[in-house]
Swiss-Prot record:
Its EC number is 1.18.6.1. Its cofactor is [8Fe-7S] cluster. It catalyses: N2 + 8 reduced [2Fe-2S]-[ferredoxin] + 16 ATP + 16 H2O = H2 + 8 oxidized [2Fe-2S]-[ferredoxin] + 2 NH4(+) + 16 ADP + 16 phosphate + 6 H(+). GO terms for biological process: nitrogen fixation. PROSITE patterns: NITROGENASE_1_1, NITROGENASE_1_2. This is Nitrogenase iron-iron protein beta chain. GO terms for molecular function: ATP binding; iron-sulfur cluster binding; metal ion binding; nitrogenase activity.
Length: 460
């Protein structure tokens, strides 16, 4: 058998793996300090996305809606945007960045949001908010094409394009994290800190894992500042961890400001983390210190303790954001596991030419890769006889795990039916250790439930 990359055989979608473009743009916007986005569309385009993110992070945050109703969908709804901007700026005096995120309905009716924002900058802002720093921009998200991944990538590009300003050269690098968890940001910043590398960490959500303090002070907002975004044009280079969640912005900085760019690999597992640290070292001239060599060794030791005996030859199905899903598949191969099914949940034609996917086709002969996939592609294959030992993916696939009694490790977005998953990294050496041990523990619990409560290590 050879690894095949195929597109979903059906036209319709049964239980999608991804949601639509505006969700990705909203997730990018919450990584910016003093930023509240306005989603130009129906209230559901905000409510359900905000619910997903809040369930995942276990934190509250602000996203506004222009609340387009039936009349606006027929006759146009630009007046709703104008009202929304004025109300938002009045109610939140500290807000400096207001992206207008379009949706399928407002893109179809052709609302000229760009033209309206020019009008607001000339009339509303000088009149109602004189002397106040306010930045308006449009993020076009026609949600009838692409997915939340497309929307995130577009938003990252549009924010960088809006603010990047050439000035004196900086000693920092740009790190575009992509769609990650607070625990991942913490791990990435730790790696950079140990290497004594300064960075503009873009669209970072570490503060969504924030403490409850005695004075009741509580913040859960993004930490990337306007100054960080402006300084991206002056950096030593850009590292975009994810090909589909930041490459457009990295390419823009490279073409416009001659900022060197490195795209990936997503640092899932030992091998990819090694590549990430090598890229940082080459870009900055900083050596990889002994502390990180030790952390790498600890991760390797933890993996050696469980890898061959408990993980080897285990059959896995994987779905998640594309860069994460591909990274997880590569890590599973490194652990001697057998990835059987990789589901990529949108119709990006670039997947077939992705060098990582090409490598998977060469190195994983038993793997089937399905693009534009949905959960029926997983469930139907199980019904047809696909035997799996483990599923890796977000919480939306939990019913397949339950119904077919296949143990599942929650990873990716959204994860809301297991406590604290957003707090633990899956990137870096710490993430490699956490992932391997979580997979092993999940298999242990499943074996105890199905086979022998007093299991013997050397017989399974």
């Amino acid at each position: 058998m050879t690894c095949q990359v195929t597109q979903k055989a059906r036209e319709g979608t049964i239980n999608p793996i991804f949601t639509c473009q505006p969700a990705g743009a909203q997730f990018a916007s919450i990584g910016i300090k003093d930023c509240i986005g306005i989603v130009h569309g129906g209230q559901g385009c905000v409510m359900f996305v905000r619910l997903l993110i809040s369930q995942h992070m276990k934190e509250s945050f602000e996203i506004a809606s222009s609340s387009v109703h039936e009349d606006g969908a027929v006759f146009g709804a630009l007046d709703r945007v104008e009202t929304a901007v004025e109300v938002l700026l009045t109610r939140y005096p500290d807000v400096k960045v207001v992206p207008i995120i379009t949706t399928c309905s407002t893109e179809i009716i052709g609302d000229d949001v760009d033209g309206l924002l020019s009008k607001l900058e000339d009339e509303l802002l000088p009149t109602k908010f004189p002397g106040r720093e306010v930045h308006l921009l449009t993020v076009h998200c026609p949600s009838f094409v692409g997915s939340m991944i497309t929307g995130y990538d577009k938003a990252v590009h549009d924010f960088v394009k809006k603010f990047a300003t050439k000035d004196e050269p900086s000693d920092k690098i740009n790190l575009i994290t992509g769609w990650v968890n607070p625990g991942d940001v913490k791990e990435l910043k730790h790696l950079l800190e140990v290497m004594e590398v300064k960075a503009n960490v873009l669209f970072e959500v570490e503060s969504f894992d924030s403490p409850l303090m005695p004075d009741l002070e509580h913040h859960s907002h993004g930490s990337t500042t306007i100054e960080d975004l402006r300084d991206t044009a002056n950096a030593k280079g850009t590292i975009a961890l994810n090909r589909y969640e930041g490459m457009k912005a990295a390419d823009y900085l490279k073409k416009k400001f001659k900022v060197p760019a490195v795209i990936g690999p997503t640092p899932v597992g030992i091998r990819n983390t090694d590549a990430f640290l090598k890229a940082v070292s080459e870009m900055t001239g900083q050596p990889i210190p002994a502390q990180l060599v030790k952390e790498r060794g600890l991760a390797l030791d933890a993996i050696a303790d469980i890898g061959h005996m408990f993980l080897a030859d285990k059959r896995v199905a994987i779905y998640a954001n594309p860069d994460l899903a591909i990274g997880l598949t590569e890590f599973c191969l490194d652990l001697e596991m057998k990835p059987k099914l990789l589901l990529l949940g949108d119709d990006n034609s670039g997947y077939v030419k992705d060098p990582r996917v090409v490598a998977l086709q060469e190195n994983a002969p038993d793997l089937e890769i399905v693009t534009n996939a949905d959960f029926w592609d997983l469930e139907s294959r199980i019904q047809q006889g696909l035997e799996l030992d483990l599923i890796l993916g977000h919480s939306k696939g939990r019913f397949i795990s339950i119904d077919y009694k296949v143990p599942m490790v929650r990873v990716g977005f959204p994860t809301y039916d297991r406590a604290g998953m957003y707090r633990h990294p899956v990137l870096g050496y710490g993430g490699a250790m956490f992932l391997a041990e979580t997979m092993a523990n999940t298999l242990f619990a499943d074996m105890e439930a199905k086979k022998n409560k007093e299991w013997i290590l050397n017989v399974w």
